Every structure is written in C-alpha cells, then in structure tokens.
C-alpha cells in the first residue's frame, strides 16, 4: 500500500506541528501517530515515553529538541510529519524544518492562547510562507476558553482565523465539537479510550444559535472567495460540502486565512477531525509547485524544478543526526526527480560528489528502508560524507543550487576543558559530530588559554550540548561559566588608509602595498562584511586581490578593542603597488590584514552586545518589582499588556544582565512569574560598560 500512495503526490502532505513549549504539541503528534496506525502503545510526554522525543535529554526534560521526521498514513493519504521544538533555544530546528514543509498545524493552549514562542514560530512560518491550520488544544483544561484563544490569534498574530468548529462544553465537560462545514456534532463523551471513534449527533440545542452565527460567517467568507459561489450564496442556494471545502482549501493554501479546530489530544478528543483537516486543507507538493534555485557558479541565472519524477533529481539537506548503528543520517526533502540507493549525486553547494548508501523513511527513531527516493517526499540518507544542513544535492548532469538557510550566530559561550587525555580525544569527535548536526553550535580555540570555547543560542541549548557530550560520547569535562558573545564594529568612515608590508631576509623579500577605505555596512540579507575591488590599471595583479580580502577577513576574527570579532564593515581596495620578485599572495594577505586593523582603529571602534527580547508574565501585584528589576539590568521597557488575568512586560535587555534571572524572578514573585527570552539584535555597549569589558579582556 505504501508504495502505491507514494507516487500520487495529491495524496502526500509534508507538515510540521508547531507550538509553544507546553501547548501539547508532542502529545498531539503522538495521537496522530496512534490514530494513523504507527504506534501501538501511546507515549505520554509526562512519562518520558513519547515517540518523537527520542533523545535521552528530551525524555528527561519533557521537551522536544530534535525534529524527528515521521511518516504515517490516514485514509489512503501519506503524511510526513516533522516534529519541531517549541523551546526558544531551538529556533534553528524550527527554521530548518519550516524550510522544507508544505504546511503546518499550529497548536495553541486553549487557556493561554497565543504565547510568546507561538508568536515567534508563527513569524518564522510566515517568512517561509507556510500555510497553516490551527488546533486549539487542552480544551479539557481548567480555564480553557476557545473564543479567547481565537481572539488572541487576531490580536497577537495579526492573522485571520476561520473558525470551522465550536467546542461542546469546556474543562471537564468538554465532550466534542460542532462541525460548521457539515453542521453536525462530533462527540467523545466521558472517558475516551485511545483510538475510539466519535459519535455523530445533532447539534445541542444550547449551541444552535451560536452554531448558526458562526456558520453564517463561514459561508460569507467562502462566498467572497469565489464569484460563482457568491452568486449561488446570494441567490439563497445551499453550498455543497465539497464547494465549501474547496474554497477553504484554496484560501488556506494561499495563506489568506487559517482554519481553526479544537480538541484535547491528551483526552483523545478532536484528533481525527484534525487529521481530516490536514488532508482537506493543507497543500500537497503539487500545490506548492516548482522550486527555484540558481545555476552552479552563477547566482543570476534562475533555474526551476517541478515536483515530478521525470525532472532531474534535486533535494535539500535540512538536518543531520547521529544514529547509534548507521552513524551520520542526513534528512533530505526531495523536490524533483528520483534517486536509487548506491547512486552518485552532486553536492552543488560544496561542489563535491557524494554517494548515497541507503535510503529510509523514518518513524521517529525507527527506520523503514525504501528502494527509491522520489519528488515530494522526506527521507533519511546514509553514506553522505560532506553534506551539511542547507546543502543542495542534485543530478550530476543537471546541477542546481537551491536557496539555502541562514542561521543566527551564537550569542552565548562556555569554555570546556576535558578532564583527561582520553577525554580530549573524545571531545574532538563529539564536537565534530555536534557541529555537523547543529549549525548554531560554534567551536573555537582560545589561543591565550588553550581552552575550547563552544557557543550556542541560550543556556538550555549549551546545557543540552554538554549533556550530549557526556552521554553519547562519554566525555568528562569541566565547564566554565557562560560568557557573552560580544562583537566589535566601526562607527566612522575612513576614506583612505595605506599600508606597506616590506620584509628583507636575504634572497627574495616580501613586498605588498595596499590603499583601502573602510566604512560601516550591513547587507540586505544581513551580511556583515563586503569587499569591493576598485583597483584599476593592473596596479595590483588580479591574482593577489583575493589575498587582500582573505587577510582582511582573518583580521576581522579578532577586533582592535578587546579581541572580539569585527562585524558590519565594508572594505574597498582603492590602489596599491607590487614588486615583480618580492610580491606574493602571502605578502598581500599580510598587507590586507594589517591595513584593516590599522584602519579599524581610526574608524571609531565600539563594542556590541546581544540584546534579548524578554517577555515576563507576572501577577499584577509584582508588576512594580519586575519593572524595577528589568530597569536595573539596563532593560528598555517596550510594552505592557494584560493577558489571561496577568500582566505581561516586554523589554529589551542585554544578555550579560540576564544570567541567573530565573532565580531572581522566582524569589521576587514567589515563583508565580515566568519569562521567555529570545535573541533580538546587537547594540552598542554604553561607555562605562565598554571600559569594563575591555579591561577584563586585555587584563588591564
């Protein structure tokens, strides 16, 4: 059966389940897997037994860290699910899974409504234009309010929800939903066994008026989307279920609106209709249509690939994972063509050939071997050596480079020191594997102390990376205190600065002269460096120009104030001179490096620090303490609002002031407040703080 469904892309859905950390996303995914026949024993996140949370740390913490790809079937349709994490430190996982999805189910907590992380994940989905349906979960929870949650979708996300179901009862009395498309009640009364089929009933009398009101809104929206339907609607004719579903599907696929359903995944209520909605309203690979890329070595030449088996093979690697038996697993989304195990393909991003060993479709951490990979699907490949996240794989005779992914730089670092020599060796392996898997994990060697310094997106992110080193790679190490990843930049333009590198050591010497201009710069795509060659008339031979650029980029690794990386600058090479015998690539590299350092000192260098967007939710009575505390941490209050009877304070606060914040917040609010924090931007450090940072870095 599986093979038959595979080839008809109308029956394939590549979706993600996206949500805030506690909205019940993993439980929802578990239920989907159970109802689609993959799981026989249901895993609860509370027990640490969930299928998609398959790394040990995830089981312990009850949060989803790695997006595991899972394939399942529903009513003769195939659904490939990417489980995305809901914790803010793992936004890279969310970004990379959204890049390869066709649609998503956004899960909201029926009591809390749209929460901070939901807003962020929603914005990421909008960036990749991913159509979504909304599932208001936890309707059995004390204080659950479906209508409030729908309103938060409008107010906090600025989105247009289309209500397709109304809840029957709430909290302990939540018994089912009113289906507004077919105007019937779908109920699961009492304690529901897992997998139990719902009962179809008449709409309860006390909901008849509300159902009629929301049905009317639904029909108006549907009629407005299509001229024929509008004529029919205004002529008083009944719209068929097929017509209504077709119109909703069209608007959903175009991201004009977002269908809203509700239920309680934990209590097994509302899961089947949500699966039906995935099939009815979310796009298949054919709806998404052709994918764009560019020719190898020429970004201006746009190429396209259709989601067809007949097209040349193209795929995007979106995740690397370590497998206990197979080693490196590369998860790919195939956009066009087909490929067999054992075939050779081109990694167009790196310009290298790769051979595919085996092909699998995954079910969390179980693997199902397949005979071919075809367009429109998600697979795990074994045997790829050089491929990393964001790389394009393609047919050797039809190269294409698909749009890659951009990942933020780490904002927090810790030093890590192996306890023994054998730990030192194991650390090398661990770091290499983890860096392959996670593009936001950075590693550098502190040349002064000889320590290895690792960087990540937050304290939890680094905790988990260190934890994995201990568990998976058996590395025992001492971990230093978290350090902030500062940057340096320039604030003024230096019109002209020249530097001559001259060295005479018997025989041939070294000679290179460069004249440069330096100015502040931020590229449209967020690039933080640009090199422009303005040399004319062969004053510097063409083969030496890249060496000047390379030397400048080397110098940018260590800034001029406190040794932090230099960012956001443009270097223009204006002129220079060379010597027939003494000039070399090395000489021009040194000249480029020294010229940049000297010019940067004259360009008003400053230190930048990461600012975090902090959102604190607190009971009213602690509001003053919370704001006072944020102000004392150099925070800038951005907004205050009321949410679910609590107060929410939004502020931008330097990361350096946020270490240990959770403990302080708990003691100030008797444990009743909570907060979320996500990287926002880099900003200039005040002069007094800058002096402290420089003194600490230079030991003065």
Swiss-Prot record:
Location, primary (coarse class): cytoplasm
Compartments, as annotated in UniProt: Cytoplasm
Presence of the UniProt keyword Ribonucleoprotein in the record: no
Gene Ontology molecular function: any one: GTPase activity
Any Pfam family hit: GTP_EFTU_D2
Signal sequence, start to end: none
Residue sites binding GTP per the record: 19-26, 83-87, 137-140
Residue ranges of domain tr-type G in the record: 10-286
UniProt keyword annotations, A-Z: Cytoplasm, Elongation factor, GTP-binding, Nucleotide-binding, Protein biosynthesis
Matching HAMAP family: EF_G_EF_2_B
Chain's role: Catalyzes the GTP-dependent ribosomal translocation step during translation elongation. During this step, the ribosome changes from the pre-translocational (PRE) to the post-translocational (POST) state as the newly formed A-site-bound peptidyl-tRNA and P-site-bound deacylated tRNA move to the P and E sites, respectively. Catalyzes the coordinated movement of the two tRNA molecules, the mRNA and conformational changes in the ribosome.
Protein name: Elongation factor G
Naturally occurring in which organism (per UniProt): Rhodococcus opacus (strain B4)
